[in-house]
Amino acid sequence: MENLDALVSQALEAVERAEDINALEQIRVNYLGKKGELTQVMKTLGNLPAEERPKVGALINDAKERVTVVLNARKAAFEEAELSARLAAECIDVTLPGRGQATGGLHPITRTLERIEQFFTHIGYGIAEGPEVEDDYHNFEALNIPGHHPARAMHDTFYFNANMLLRTHTSPVQVRTMESTQPPIRIVCPGRVYRCDSDITHSPMFHQVEGLLIDRDINFADLKGTIEEFLRVFFEKELAVRFRPSFFPFTEPSAEVDIQCVMCSGNGCRVCKQTGWLEVMGCGMVHPNVLRMSGIDPEEFQGFAFGMGAERLAMLRYGVNDLRLFFDNDLRFLAQFR
């Protein structure tokens, strides 16, 4: 057993001299591994008398345990020192700002539509929607647009066949509402519409909001007051507004609505073509023929209607000079509206 004590002393001294974890691992293999010196001593038990084996085996196991405990303690000390050194080298300044997350925002056209809807719902209007693929009757015939009208031409309208087309305005929603609802009616109809047109101020697809009010004793003064108040709230400023006589098949009388140029305050600029005025919408009193075709008696009820392009209003509100920018999906442009 003197040899066993000597092996234990050698092992413990080797552990004390070890400079790193790799050295400790080598010591473990030399003394406790399958071919280690203490393991080899255990294999000599078979050469001893049977009555001595338990006592000697216990001594060998005790020796291995002593070496294992010291070796593990030394290894833990190395690991703790290594961790402390790494933490010191990787010091984190917890006062630094965190990484921000990219956030999205509402599209300027969506913002514009919501702004329009918010005003009209606040004064008692409802929101009405309808199909974008329309039939000829609701898109033209029911709106007092005869077969020879230029709007029915192939170069202005996207046709699927002789009777089905992509709606050119949201007016069919008004017709469907009048057919299914008894007056009084107060609705705005936002939605996508389609026309064969594409340039700096036009797109083959754009967003339109039309409004309709049907009730007894409605006159042009009601229409005028509604539109003037809407424009004041939408642009958040007092603007001069004028109504120019115009013609639409579905309204009589009809008018185009102009506002004082928001770019030059009416002094004349490139945007308003030096006139000081900008056209923003069309409007008028609902034509008696439209009321009759929808099953409403024009002798009892009257109404007004108006329509505006959301892109047009967004361009004026945000100072955008090219309508196509709204649909280019350029994040540099869209990020300005967050």
Curated annotation (Swiss-Prot):
Q: Which reaction does it catalyse?
A: tRNA(Phe) + L-phenylalanine + ATP = L-phenylalanyl-tRNA(Phe) + AMP + diphosphate + H(+)
The organism's superkingdom is given as Bacteria
Q: Where does Mg(2+) bind?
A: 252
Binding note for cofactor: Binds 2 magnesium ions per tetramer.
Question: Where does this protein reside within or beyond the cell?
Answer: Cytoplasm
Which cellular component, as a GO term, is one annotated location?
Answer: cytoplasm
Q: Which GO terms describe its biological process?
A: phenylalanyl-tRNA aminoacylation
Q: Name one Pfam family in it.
A: Phe_tRNA-synt_N
Q: List the keywords (alphabetical).
A: Aminoacyl-tRNA synthetase, ATP-binding, Cytoplasm, Ligase, Magnesium, Metal-binding, Nucleotide-binding, Protein biosynthesis
* Key word Metal-binding present: yes
Q: A Gene Ontology molecular-function term?
A: ATP binding
Q: List the disulfide bonds.
A: none
Please state the Enzyme Commission number of this protein. Answer: 6.1.1.20
Q: Name the coenzymes or cofactors required.
A: Mg(2+)
| Primary location | cytoplasm
Q: Quaternary structure?
A: Tetramer of two alpha and two beta subunits.
Similarity section? Belongs to the class-II aminoacyl-tRNA synthetase family. Phe-tRNA synthetase alpha subunit type 1 subfamily.
- UniProt protein name: Phenylalanine--tRNA ligase alpha subunit
Question: Native species of this protein?
Answer: Pseudomonas putida (strain ATCC 47054 / DSM 6125 / CFBP 8728 / NCIMB 11950 / KT2440)
